[in-house]
Every structure is written in C-alpha cells, then in structure tokens.
Amino acid sequence: MSARGGPLARLEARITREWQRRGALAWALTPFACVFGLCAALRRTAYTQGWKQPVDVGVPVVVVGNVTVGGTGKTPTVIALVDALRAAGFTPGVVSRGYGANVQAPTAVTAASRASAAGDEPLLIARRTGAPVWVCPDRVAAAQALRAAHPEVDVIVSDDGLQHYRLARTVELVVFDHRLGGNGFLLPAGPLREPLSRHRDATLVNDPYSGALPPWPDTYALALTPGAAWHLDQPTLRRPLSQFANERVLAAAGIGAPERFFATLRAAGLAPATRALPDHYAFADNPFVDDAVDAILITEKDAVKLGASWRDARLWVVPVEAALDPRLIALVVEKLRGRSPA
C-alpha cells in the first residue's frame, strides 16, 4: 500500500530534508540567515544587557523549548515534567501560545475545551495532566491570568517560548530529536532559530534510532515510549500494539516530525503504511475514507482535534510517555528551590 500525503506535507518533508545538508539551496539562503541571526541576536541582547526588562510573574518559570523548527518531543516532555514537579511537592501550571487556535487574549484550557479554541498541544496537556493551562500569544499575560485564577500555583511550565524573552524564567530546557541542529544553519538556510551554542540549563535529546548523545554539557537522554492504543470512540477499549501486527494498518500523523511516530511503531514490530499530514492538521474532513485498512493509528495530538462527529471505527490512538532522567528532575527542582527568576 502506498503512502500518500498532501502537497503541504510533501513540501514540509522536502524542506526538512534540505535542512539536513549543506546543499546549494542552503548556501543560497545564507545571506537571509545572516539577517535573521542578527535580528534574533539583537532581540536577545536587549534583554540580556538590560535594555529591556523581562517580566517576573511572581513564581519560578521553567521553559521547555527548542532552538530548531519542528517537533522534537516538547509536549510529552512538558507532561512528564508537570507530573515530576507535582511528585516533588510543587503545584504546577502551564502556559502556551495556543498555536493553531484563534486566541487573542488569555484563555483557560480545560479537558472540555475544543482544539480550535485552545490549540491541540495545550488541550492534550490539560487532559493528560489536569493542571491549570492558559494560552495566549503573550505568554506573560497568560502566566499572569493563570496566577490570578489559580493562586495556589507555585511554578509555571512554559510549553515552548524559549525565544519569548519578555517572560522571566528560572530554568531553560532545550529539546532535540535525532536531527539535532540539522545542517547547523539559521533560518531559512537551516532549521535553527538560534545558534546551537545558545545557553540553556539542560539539553534533552530524543533519539529513537541510535540513542547516542552529543558531547554537550548537561545533556540527558529523553525516552519516548508508546503505550497500549485506545479506541477513539471507546477510550476504555485498549489493545497492545503487538495485536496490530497481523492487520492492515495505516499510521497517520499531523505532527512536526511524523517519521518519528512511524519509527516508534516499527520499533514495536509493526509494518504500517504511513501518511504524513501537515503539522497541526485541522481534520476538517476524514482523509482516510478511501483507505482499505483494518486499523488507523494516530497520535494523541491529532486525536484531540477529532470531535464527536468522527465515527470511523478503525481509529486507534497511540499514547506516548516521556521518561525523564532522575538527574534532570533533581537539577530542575534544585534550581527552582534555590534561585529566583532572572
């Protein structure tokens, strides 16, 4: 069975491939990358040199972000971090931009929210953690609104926002996948939003292929493990992935790095046909109606966008759990208890 994807998904895949090598296109775009890098450096310098002051929202902030474009595993990392902080005695809340949603003002996200109004990632975080989640393009405003509504919150986790320097932060965690920094060039010649040398408190690397870690200081492995699939229409109905081995399976993902999801399924012993959808795919209609398969495996991030009108009995959702290194958790807790936002 051949894999299909829309033009946008194919374009995203082409750009991603180009960003992994220093080909003619990358070199042709380096003048634009220099301009991008200068603008980014000036913006960061404005805060590091005191020309602009970051806003202290009154509690420590942990930023989980990346210096590259595309998915690296931030959302499961945020979920695992919220659980770890709660286990350490904190009362965490989460702020996010709400990418993909029409959000202009600080908005609370609950398990009953719609992805179109909250964003798929914040909605998934709210459902998985039960923590207070607020979204707004202005993360400072989101954090202030969260604190006003939930004064019991004593630490805020920012889902992405590494480059949102206006929000004062106590800890910065940068997440990479196996692609690391790609060709090492800044946008648009490469995938980097900032240089790889950018300071951070710790680096997490999610590499399902080799498991190797780069020789960077304070670097920890990030393991993402799939759980038993649950049925979209009957969430209490669960099946181990091994039970799909002898069925005709299509794996579909509208995430930043769909190939990583497909690799996870292959590592579990499946050989699915694959469908890469554009990141934050809206699922305005069912793209699977013509697929002659027994089961369709999708990500949790995609599942939150499928409402009650979806009645495709073939849809199964594969949850992913992030395992954080205990040393990383200890590092974060130590910094939260011993340092004020800066």
From Swiss-Prot:
Annotated keywords: ATP-binding, Kinase, Lipid A biosynthesis, Lipid biosynthesis, Lipid metabolism, Nucleotide-binding, Transferase
SUPFAM superfamilies: P-loop containing nucleoside triphosphate hydrolases
Cellular component terms per the entry's GO annotation: plasma membrane
A Pfam family recorded for this sequence: LpxK
EC numbers for this chain: 2.7.1.130
GO biological process, alphabetically ordered: lipid A biosynthetic process; lipopolysaccharide core region biosynthetic process
Keyword Transcription among record annotations: no
Molecular function terms from GO: ATP binding; tetraacyldisaccharide 4'-kinase activity
Name of the top EC class for this enzyme: transferase
Record-listed ATP binding positions: T68, V69, G70, G71, T72, G73, K74, T75
Domain of life, source organism: Bacteria
Catalytic activity from the UniProt record: a lipid A disaccharide + ATP = a lipid IVA + ADP + H(+)
Pathway per the UniProt entry: Glycolipid biosynthesis; lipid IV(A) biosynthesis; lipid IV(A) from (3R)-3-hydroxytetradecanoyl-[acyl-carrier-protein] and UDP-N-acetyl-alpha-D-glucosamine: step 6/6
InterPro entries, A to Z: LpxK, P-loop_NTPase
Family indicated by similarity: Belongs to the LpxK family.
HAMAP family (alphabetical): LpxK
Functional note: Transfers the gamma-phosphate of ATP to the 4'-position of a tetraacyldisaccharide 1-phosphate intermediate (termed DS-1-P) to form tetraacyldisaccharide 1,4'-bis-phosphate (lipid IVA).
Protein name: Tetraacyldisaccharide 4'-kinase
Organism: Burkholderia vietnamiensis (strain G4 / LMG 22486)
